[in-house]
Amino acid sequence: MKKILSNRKAEGYIDVAVGIIALMMVLVVTLNIYTFFMLRQDLDTVSGFLIETATSEGSFGEEFDERCEELRSSFFEFDVVASADEYYNSTYERVQLGDKMTVTVSVHTYVRGVGAFKIPVTVSTTRSGISEKYWK
């Protein structure tokens, strides 16, 4: 490195400039990967809370929606897709005891630090559980 900097030819300066630019690009990619991992961890937490609420209530009803809004105000804006293998009452989205319930939480974001380009990325996580409520 000392030889490159002490060399009076212009190619040494160009090599250093290209090296610094390459180092910055690696740093940007590393920070983006770290950000996506942290976002994924937050999504896992949110989906865990939501599936816990849904399975204990045995439905994707009013209490589930209230919990969604509470988590949106605490964390960030996210999309939720809730489904079940079989509904006991599809109007109220009730799921019978022992049936599988699934919650998918996703966030649409962009890769940052690449200049004028916007590269869209969707980060999502899925959790499932078994309904704990018996409907008569």
What are these regions (language model features)?
Residues 45, 49-104:
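Short amphipathic secondary-structure patches
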Residues 1, 19, 73-75, 84, ...:
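Extended interaction regions within the primary functional domain
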Residues 19, 28, 67, 116-120, ...:
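Surface-exposed beta-strand edges and their flanking turn/coil or helix-capping segments
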Residues 14, 63, 100, 115-117, ...:
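Compositionally biased, intrinsically disordered low-complexity regions
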Residues 2-65:
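Alpha-helical assembly-interface signal, strongest on the long, hydrophobic N-terminal helix that forms
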Residues 106-136:
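Low-complexity, S/T/G/P-rich flexible repeat/linker segments used as non-globular hinges
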Residues 32, 92-94, 116:
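Residues embedded in well-ordered secondary-structure elements
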